[in-house]
């Protein structure tokens, strides 16, 4: 989450007149994340999250995202529920942007994920995959493999200023990853960005899965690969196979992986590392200096990619 667009008290008060959630008591910007402008909103009726959509989000995709969230919430998944205005709309204009209000979920995200977090995460992700099976609309993954070469091209040679030779290393890894990319694996709706700051815990149980604005219809095992990257590396970039094993066991207790999915884990993990390296690099270059936003170091994913390039099989991930 982040803040790019400022909202005045008067504009927000007028916006809330269209909703049955009471009057504004307080609101503040949330600096974490890099995508949309987000505010914590308290009204006389309770706590909510206000999101103004920015940057990579295509307005045409918003009904799909919010529809998926409503669908998953109806299946008892702990995800935000979009709040509809009096006229039934869940998207409305505010401060020159399209905006939505969603319910607030209690809990905190784990700053230092442990093995105890990884098992519940895997199980929750599998339940999410199964719960989305009967959500009929589909959405192509704009940041899937076909999107990585043009993203690298847009970064130009700027990667070499971050680390000498980075652009060439990433290009070589990308070419090899695309050549080995699996196509015929089970697919459905995935979160595609299930990082620790998008997962809330309360009393050692998952209380919230948030930020579905990269969700898409893609390989289930790719969603797992994203999480292996995000949850299973230590601060020194060593891979924690105990965390990985817990995550995979938690997932497979709900939805067992096929042999082909298991075999594909190394290349899927390489692809996930490349995806986040590239988007972080692009944001590193292009984030405005005055934006209330936390930029993330692209090299965090360079070192992850180095591990995946050396992985010989799924056994290196604890399978």
Curated annotation (Swiss-Prot):
SUPFAM superfamilies: Protein kinase-like (PK-like). Pathway: Amino-acid biosynthesis; L-threonine biosynthesis; L-threonine from L-aspartate: step 4/5. GO terms for biological process: threonine biosynthetic process. GO terms for molecular function: ATP binding; homoserine kinase activity. It catalyses: L-homoserine + ATP = O-phospho-L-homoserine + ADP + H(+). It is an enzyme of class 2 (transferase). Keywords: Amino-acid biosynthesis, ATP-binding, Kinase, Nucleotide-binding, Threonine biosynthesis, Transferase. Belongs to the pseudomonas-type ThrB family. This is Homoserine kinase.
